[in-house]
């Protein structure tokens, strides 16, 4: 269910992400070079489990900003409760937290752009990292890439009246990747089948 590591890496190459370090499981070692802009896609589970949920992280050294993007916009408590995942571990393992002053800005997504039963988390991570590549000072919002999707307060994730927003977001994400990724275009039907809006329900 969802996107494989090979798929995400192939689409990331098409998007020409700056210093994309790759895809990782929850043991991601963090950003080891504080002076270079870089980004990665990280799963909340160990690799041997097959994975659960994709997140994106990015580091902008000019402003010393660490970006943490979760397509569901879960709070720290929810991430720990639902996935047993704490992004603080990423910071502690990163060189950006090992510098003498340890001074940085953390910017974390707080709204949901992905529907509750969608398996497109990896694709939304690519969308965010494409925004980071183009607009590293404001990748979360107020740029032409992330403005393609609309955020919803996380506590409304399951509300019926916001589900059309999630459908439109997923279609916008597919359309963006179709424009910018040859790999997505070549494998569109398989990718969409494995990530569609109700994929999680199919697995129950």
Curated annotation (Swiss-Prot):
Cell compartment(s), UniProt: Virion; Host nucleus
EC number: 3.4.22.39
Any one annotated GO CC term: host cell nucleus
Enzyme class: hydrolase
Active site: 53, 70, 121
Entry's Gene Ontology BP terms: proteolysis
Induction: Expressed in the late phase of the viral replicative cycle.
Gene Ontology molecular function, alphabetical: cysteine-type endopeptidase activity; DNA binding
Keyword field: Autocatalytic cleavage, Disulfide bond, DNA-binding, Host nucleus, Hydrolase, Late protein, Protease, Thiol protease, Virion
Reaction equation(s) it catalyzes: Cleaves proteins of the adenovirus and its host cell at two consensus sites: -Yaa-Xaa-Gly-Gly-|-Xaa- and -Yaa-Xaa-Gly-Xaa-|-Gly- (in which Yaa is Met, Ile or Leu, and Xaa is any amino acid)
Record comment: activity regulation: Requires DNA and protease cofactor for maximal activation. Inside nascent virions, becomes partially activated by binding to the viral DNA, allowing it to cleave the cofactor that binds to the protease and fully activates it. Actin, like the viral protease cofactor, seems to act as a cofactor in the cleavage of cytokeratin 18 and of actin itself.
Pfam families on file: Peptidase_C5
UniProt-annotated site: Cleavage, residues: 50-51
Biological function: Cleaves viral precursor proteins (pTP, pIIIa, pVI, pVII, pVIII, and pX) inside newly assembled particles giving rise to mature virions. Protease complexed to its cofactor slides along the viral DNA to specifically locate and cleave the viral precursors. Mature virions have a weakened organization compared to the unmature virions, thereby facilitating subsequent uncoating. Without maturation, the particle lacks infectivity and is unable to uncoat. Late in adenovirus infection, in the cytoplasm, may participate in the cytoskeleton destruction. Cleaves host cell cytoskeletal keratins K7 and K18.
HAMAP family tied to this protein: ADV_PRO
Family under the similarity heading: Belongs to the peptidase C5 family.
Subunit relationships: Interacts with protease cofactor pVI-C; this interaction is necessary for protease activation.
Name used for this protein in its record: Protease
Species this chain originates from: Porcine adenovirus A serotype 3
Gene label: L3
